[in-house]
Amino acid sequence: MTHTCVLTWLAEKYTMYLNMRKGVGFMEAISREDALALLKKYNKDPFHLQHAFTVEAVMKWFAKEMGYGDDADYWGIVGLLHDIDFELYPTEHCVKAPELLREGGVGEDIIHAVVSHGYGITIGNGTTLDTKPEHTMEKVLFAVDELTGLIGAAALMRPSKSTKDMELKSLKKKYKSKGFAAGCSREVIERGAEQLGWELDKLLTLTLQAMAATEDELRREIEN
Protein backbone atom coordinates (compact mmCIF):
# COMPACT_ATOMS: atom_id res chain seq x y z
CA MET A 1 0.00 0.00 0.00
CA THR A 2 1.08 3.61 -0.55
CA HIS A 3 1.34 5.98 2.43
CA THR A 4 -2.01 7.54 1.49
CA CYS A 5 -3.67 4.12 1.19
CA VAL A 6 -2.35 3.12 4.62
CA LEU A 7 -3.75 6.28 6.20
CA THR A 8 -7.12 5.71 4.51
CA TRP A 9 -7.18 2.09 5.68
CA LEU A 10 -6.36 3.10 9.28
CA ALA A 11 -9.02 5.82 9.27
CA GLU A 12 -11.68 3.42 8.03
CA LYS A 13 -10.71 0.76 10.57
CA TYR A 14 -10.93 3.33 13.37
CA THR A 15 -14.33 4.52 12.18
CA MET A 16 -15.62 0.94 12.14
CA TYR A 17 -14.22 0.45 15.66
CA LEU A 18 -16.07 3.54 16.90
CA ASN A 19 -19.28 2.35 15.27
CA MET A 20 -19.01 -0.98 17.04
CA ARG A 21 -18.41 0.80 20.36
CA LYS A 22 -21.66 2.69 19.72
CA GLY A 23 -23.50 -0.58 19.16
CA VAL A 24 -24.20 -0.10 15.48
CA GLY A 25 -21.41 -2.25 14.09
CA PHE A 26 -21.87 -5.41 12.11
CA MET A 27 -20.62 -7.87 14.70
CA GLU A 28 -23.22 -6.73 17.21
CA ALA A 29 -26.00 -6.41 14.66
CA ILE A 30 -26.52 -9.54 12.59
CA SER A 31 -24.94 -12.89 11.82
CA ARG A 32 -24.59 -14.32 8.35
CA GLU A 33 -27.28 -16.89 9.19
CA ASP A 34 -29.70 -14.16 10.26
CA ALA A 35 -28.79 -12.02 7.25
CA LEU A 36 -29.58 -14.91 4.91
CA ALA A 37 -32.92 -15.51 6.64
CA LEU A 38 -33.72 -11.81 6.28
CA LEU A 39 -32.80 -11.87 2.60
CA LYS A 40 -35.01 -14.89 1.96
CA LYS A 41 -37.90 -13.27 3.82
CA TYR A 42 -38.19 -10.70 1.04
CA ASN A 43 -36.63 -12.55 -1.90
CA LYS A 44 -37.85 -15.83 -3.42
CA ASP A 45 -36.74 -15.51 -7.06
CA PRO A 46 -33.74 -17.83 -7.64
CA PHE A 47 -32.15 -15.23 -9.92
CA HIS A 48 -32.24 -12.57 -7.21
CA LEU A 49 -30.83 -14.97 -4.63
CA GLN A 50 -28.05 -16.03 -6.98
CA HIS A 51 -27.14 -12.39 -7.58
CA ALA A 52 -27.02 -11.78 -3.82
CA PHE A 53 -24.75 -14.80 -3.30
CA THR A 54 -22.55 -13.70 -6.20
CA VAL A 55 -22.06 -10.19 -4.87
CA GLU A 56 -21.47 -11.56 -1.37
CA ALA A 57 -18.68 -13.84 -2.62
CA VAL A 58 -17.11 -11.12 -4.77
CA MET A 59 -17.19 -8.61 -1.92
CA LYS A 60 -15.42 -11.07 0.39
CA TRP A 61 -12.78 -11.67 -2.27
CA PHE A 62 -12.17 -7.95 -2.68
CA ALA A 63 -11.91 -7.46 1.09
CA LYS A 64 -9.09 -9.98 1.21
CA GLU A 65 -7.45 -8.66 -1.96
CA MET A 66 -7.46 -5.06 -0.73
CA GLY A 67 -6.12 -5.65 2.77
CA TYR A 68 -9.41 -5.83 4.66
CA GLY A 69 -9.31 -9.58 5.25
CA ASP A 70 -10.40 -9.28 8.88
CA ASP A 71 -13.58 -7.62 7.64
CA ALA A 72 -14.31 -10.04 4.80
CA ASP A 73 -17.47 -11.39 6.42
CA TYR A 74 -18.68 -7.83 7.01
CA TRP A 75 -18.15 -6.96 3.34
CA GLY A 76 -19.92 -10.18 2.42
CA ILE A 77 -22.99 -9.39 4.52
CA VAL A 78 -23.31 -6.04 2.77
CA GLY A 79 -23.13 -7.80 -0.59
CA LEU A 80 -25.68 -10.38 0.50
CA LEU A 81 -28.22 -7.76 1.59
CA HIS A 82 -27.61 -5.02 -0.95
CA ASP A 83 -30.75 -5.70 -3.05
CA ILE A 84 -33.01 -6.80 -0.20
CA ASP A 85 -35.89 -4.55 -1.29
CA PHE A 86 -35.65 -4.98 -5.05
CA GLU A 87 -37.92 -8.00 -5.55
CA LEU A 88 -40.94 -6.68 -3.65
CA TYR A 89 -40.36 -2.95 -4.02
CA PRO A 90 -38.58 -2.37 -7.35
CA THR A 91 -39.80 1.22 -7.71
CA GLU A 92 -38.54 1.99 -4.18
CA HIS A 93 -35.18 0.26 -4.52
CA CYS A 94 -32.71 1.52 -1.89
CA VAL A 95 -35.51 3.64 -0.36
CA LYS A 96 -37.46 0.79 1.23
CA ALA A 97 -34.29 -1.07 2.25
CA PRO A 98 -33.57 0.88 5.48
CA GLU A 99 -37.00 -0.01 6.87
CA LEU A 100 -36.61 -3.72 6.08
CA LEU A 101 -33.06 -3.83 7.41
CA ARG A 102 -33.84 -1.99 10.66
CA GLU A 103 -36.75 -4.35 11.29
CA GLY A 104 -34.24 -7.18 10.87
CA GLY A 105 -31.83 -5.72 13.42
CA VAL A 106 -29.21 -4.56 10.94
CA GLY A 107 -26.82 -1.79 12.00
CA GLU A 108 -26.78 1.68 10.48
CA ASP A 109 -23.34 1.14 8.94
CA ILE A 110 -24.62 -1.71 6.79
CA ILE A 111 -27.78 0.24 5.97
CA HIS A 112 -25.70 3.17 4.72
CA ALA A 113 -23.61 0.83 2.59
CA VAL A 114 -26.68 -0.84 1.08
CA VAL A 115 -28.34 2.47 0.23
CA SER A 116 -25.13 3.97 -1.16
CA HIS A 117 -24.89 1.41 -3.96
CA GLY A 118 -27.74 3.27 -5.66
CA TYR A 119 -25.97 6.65 -5.56
CA GLY A 120 -26.94 8.94 -8.43
CA ILE A 121 -29.43 6.48 -9.89
CA THR A 122 -33.03 7.53 -10.58
CA ILE A 123 -35.38 4.75 -9.49
CA GLY A 124 -38.87 3.84 -10.65
CA ASN A 125 -40.72 6.36 -8.49
CA GLY A 126 -38.63 9.22 -9.90
CA THR A 127 -36.35 9.63 -6.89
CA THR A 128 -32.64 10.20 -7.55
CA LEU A 129 -30.67 8.51 -4.79
CA ASP A 130 -28.15 10.76 -3.06
CA THR A 131 -26.42 8.63 -0.42
CA LYS A 132 -22.81 8.62 -1.58
CA PRO A 133 -20.41 5.67 -1.14
CA GLU A 134 -17.77 6.76 1.39
CA HIS A 135 -15.96 3.69 2.72
CA THR A 136 -13.80 1.68 0.31
CA MET A 137 -16.20 -1.23 0.83
CA GLU A 138 -19.13 0.91 -0.33
CA LYS A 139 -17.23 2.02 -3.42
CA VAL A 140 -16.41 -1.59 -4.29
CA LEU A 141 -20.06 -2.59 -3.91
CA PHE A 142 -21.14 0.26 -6.20
CA ALA A 143 -18.55 -0.76 -8.78
CA VAL A 144 -19.12 -4.52 -8.87
CA ASP A 145 -22.90 -4.80 -8.53
CA GLU A 146 -23.78 -4.23 -12.19
CA LEU A 147 -20.51 -5.72 -13.40
CA THR A 148 -21.09 -9.12 -11.78
CA GLY A 149 -24.34 -9.35 -13.72
CA LEU A 150 -22.60 -8.58 -16.99
CA ILE A 151 -19.81 -11.08 -16.34
CA GLY A 152 -22.33 -13.72 -15.32
CA ALA A 153 -24.26 -13.18 -18.55
CA ALA A 154 -21.03 -13.41 -20.55
CA ALA A 155 -20.16 -16.69 -18.84
CA LEU A 156 -23.51 -18.20 -19.85
CA MET A 157 -22.65 -17.54 -23.50
CA ARG A 158 -19.52 -19.69 -23.25
CA PRO A 159 -19.47 -23.46 -23.92
CA SER A 160 -18.09 -23.99 -20.41
CA LYS A 161 -20.72 -21.73 -18.80
CA SER A 162 -17.83 -20.64 -16.59
CA THR A 163 -15.80 -17.56 -15.74
CA LYS A 164 -12.70 -19.67 -15.10
CA ASP A 165 -11.64 -19.80 -18.74
CA MET A 166 -12.83 -16.31 -19.65
CA GLU A 167 -10.14 -13.90 -20.78
CA LEU A 168 -10.22 -10.16 -20.28
CA LYS A 169 -10.35 -9.50 -24.03
CA SER A 170 -13.48 -11.65 -24.30
CA LEU A 171 -15.12 -9.76 -21.44
CA LYS A 172 -14.18 -6.40 -22.96
CA LYS A 173 -15.74 -7.41 -26.27
CA LYS A 174 -19.03 -8.18 -24.51
CA TYR A 175 -18.73 -4.99 -22.46
CA LYS A 176 -18.38 -2.84 -25.57
CA SER A 177 -21.41 -4.45 -27.22
CA LYS A 178 -24.24 -2.16 -26.13
CA GLY A 179 -26.86 -4.75 -26.97
CA PHE A 180 -25.33 -7.37 -24.70
CA ALA A 181 -26.69 -7.45 -21.13
CA ALA A 182 -28.11 -4.00 -21.79
CA GLY A 183 -29.64 -3.88 -18.32
CA CYS A 184 -26.16 -3.80 -16.77
CA SER A 185 -25.33 -0.10 -16.80
CA ARG A 186 -21.91 0.64 -18.25
CA GLU A 187 -22.24 4.18 -16.93
CA VAL A 188 -22.60 2.93 -13.36
CA ILE A 189 -19.69 0.51 -13.77
CA GLU A 190 -17.46 3.28 -15.09
CA ARG A 191 -18.50 5.64 -12.30
CA GLY A 192 -17.63 2.87 -9.88
CA ALA A 193 -14.14 2.53 -11.30
CA GLU A 194 -13.71 6.29 -11.13
CA GLN A 195 -14.79 6.43 -7.48
CA LEU A 196 -12.15 3.83 -6.65
CA GLY A 197 -9.53 5.74 -8.61
CA TRP A 198 -9.06 2.79 -10.98
CA GLU A 199 -8.87 2.41 -14.72
CA LEU A 200 -11.82 0.46 -16.10
CA ASP A 201 -9.51 -2.40 -17.13
CA LYS A 202 -8.41 -2.85 -13.52
CA LEU A 203 -12.00 -3.14 -12.31
CA LEU A 204 -12.87 -5.59 -15.10
CA THR A 205 -9.76 -7.68 -14.43
CA LEU A 206 -10.20 -7.91 -10.66
CA THR A 207 -13.93 -8.59 -10.78
CA LEU A 208 -13.41 -11.33 -13.35
CA GLN A 209 -10.71 -12.83 -11.12
CA ALA A 210 -13.05 -12.61 -8.13
CA MET A 211 -15.86 -14.41 -9.91
CA ALA A 212 -13.56 -17.12 -11.23
CA ALA A 213 -12.02 -17.66 -7.79
CA THR A 214 -15.40 -17.92 -6.05
CA GLU A 215 -17.33 -19.81 -8.73
CA ASP A 216 -17.17 -23.21 -7.03
CA GLU A 217 -18.13 -21.72 -3.67
CA LEU A 218 -21.06 -19.95 -5.28
CA ARG A 219 -22.24 -23.13 -6.99
CA ARG A 220 -22.26 -24.97 -3.65
CA GLU A 221 -24.21 -22.13 -2.03
CA ILE A 222 -26.85 -22.18 -4.77
CA GLU A 223 -27.22 -25.95 -4.59
CA ASN A 224 -27.82 -25.92 -0.81
Tell me the role of every PLM-derived stretch.
Residues 25-89:
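Acidic/His-rich, divalent-metal-binding segments that scaffold phosphate/diphosphate chemistry
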Residues 68-180:
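Divalent metal-dependent catalytic cores for phosphoryl transfer on phosphate-bearing substrates
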Residues 58-65, 72, 187, 199-214:
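Active-site hotspot residues in diverse enzymes, especially metal/ion-binding acidic/histidine motifs
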Residues 163-205:
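Divalent-cation-assisted or electrostatically stabilized phosphate/pyrophosphate-binding catalytic cores
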Residues 19, 26-32, 196-224:
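N-terminal charge/polar-biased segments
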